[in-house]
């Protein structure tokens, strides 16, 4: 435990020195597909998102695709919860262990909004029509242990956003590595998320009819035209994470995680999390996300979890719950269920 504390303190001190200096420009609001930045699962969110260095977790498909290389059997995980401003966030993951050939995973993420009134300048109370938004990410992941300490993984994703009759779409990749160091099991994870093409909205909502010369009569009064929208990049993340155990006994484990993140649309920041594990049955978690982020609203996060081996089968049922504080925007409660066959 002493050596784990030394390593963790050293890592935090280096990162704090780097991130304590605010960047002159955060580039906030310059990327699209913001739903890709939402923490997927309850376990990871309960630890403040500090899981890039964790191993054998199915939700690592989102955080670091290399971390699923140690997954055993067939795993299924899904969740559905209310996001901010009455939106709904849903996800599903499937992981399949191929033995020495590695692990493959499939994932789907969806963020949707309820119907709302279509309003215009001339009809601010509504035209009688309704619109909604829908974001989708569907991906395929492959991860493999290259040695007994080092794993490599990657994901290929299709990303789409819809607003009423307009759509933007592109493709992206995630790449990650995970290395278990010889220093008392401390693990180092590195990942790049959402490296891909730019997106812009296109569809019949951009089609208009205009009169190019309103001062003259008798000319062509209506010309079909299209609003030309701009391309915007995806929210790119570079993560470096450390994880390990302060305490590791037969009945009790206290694990930690600390992630340093460099996004392309905000200032650099740290995530820190802890997980107390009692006999692999009961889990208590806490986290501090977005440390040193400029103008952050995120507060502490908390979580609990439970493993249950279904009678007369080898199926493991896992239930995870987390509570995340978003300051003036309220709290987000996550609940997800996992099965491992």
Residue spans of the language-model regions?
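Subset of outer-membrane beta-barrel
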Residues: 18-341
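Bacterial Sec-dependent N-terminal signal peptides
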Residues: 1-23
């Amino acid at each position: 435990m002493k050596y784990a504390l030394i390593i963790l303190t050293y890592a935090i001190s280096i990162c704090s020195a780097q991130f304590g200096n605010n960047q002159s420009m955060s580039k906030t609001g310059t990327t699209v597909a913001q739903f890709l930045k939402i923490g997927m699962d309850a376990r990871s969110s309960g630890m403040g998102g500090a899981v890039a260095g964790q191993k054998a977790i199915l939700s690592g498909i989102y955080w670091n695709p290399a971390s699923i290389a140690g997954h055993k059997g067939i795993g299924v995980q899904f969740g559905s919860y209310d996001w901010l401003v009455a939106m709904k966030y849903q996800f599903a993951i499937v992981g399949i262990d191929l033995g020495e050939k590695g692990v493959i995973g499939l994932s789907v993420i969806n963020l949707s909004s309820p119907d709302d009134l279509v309003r215009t300048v001339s009809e601010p109370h509504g035209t009688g029509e309704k619109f909604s938004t829908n974001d989708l990410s569907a991906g395929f992941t492959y991860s493999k242990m290259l040695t007994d300490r080092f794993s490599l993984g990657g994901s290929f994703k299709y990303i789409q956003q819809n607003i009423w009759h307009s759509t933007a779409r592109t493709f992206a990749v995630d790449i990650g590595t995970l290395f278990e160091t010889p220093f008392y099991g401390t693990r180092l994870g590195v990942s790049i998320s959402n490296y891909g093409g730019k997106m812009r909205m296109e569809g019949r909502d951009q089609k208009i009819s205009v009169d190019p010369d309103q001062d003259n009569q008798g000319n062509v009064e209506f010309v079909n035209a299209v609003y030309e929208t701009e391309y915007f990049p995806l929210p790119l993340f570079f993560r470096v994470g450390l994880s390990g155990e302060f305490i590791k006994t037969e009945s009790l484990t206290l694990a930690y995680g600390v992630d340093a993140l460099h996004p392309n649309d905000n200032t650099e920041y740290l995530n820190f999390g802890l997980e107390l594990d009692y006999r692999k049955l009961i889990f208590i978690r806490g986290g501090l996300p977005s440390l040193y982020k400029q103008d952050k609203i995120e507060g502490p996060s908390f979580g609990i979890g439970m493993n249950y081996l279904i009678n007369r089968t080898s199926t493991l049922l896992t239930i995870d719950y987390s509570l995340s504080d978003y300051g003036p925007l309220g709290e987000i409660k996550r609940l997800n269920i996992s099965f491992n066959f």
